[in-house]
Amino acid sequence: NIQIICCKHTPACCT
């Protein structure tokens, strides 16, 4: 999922 990858680069994206 794109969210998982985004979380790796930007934690704020994970929330």
From Swiss-Prot:
Subcellular localization: Secreted
Threonine amide PTM positions: T15
Main location (coarse class): secreted
Recorded GO MF terms: toxin activity
Keywords for this protein: Amidation, Disulfide bond, Neurotoxin, Secreted, Toxin
PTM annotation: Contains 2 disulfide bonds. Contains 2 disulfide bonds that can be either 'C1-C3, C2-C4' or 'C1-C4, C2-C3', since these disulfide connectivities have been observed for conotoxins with cysteine framework V (for examples, see AC P0DQQ7 and AC P81755)..
Tissue spec: Expressed by the venom duct. Is mostly present in part 5 of the venom duct (distal part near the pharynx), and less abundantly present in part 4 of the venom duct.
Domain of life (superkingdom): Eukaryota
Gene Ontology CC annotations of this record: extracellular region
Domain note: The cysteine framework is V (CC-CC).
Family: Belongs to the conotoxin T superfamily.
Protein name: Conotoxin tx5d
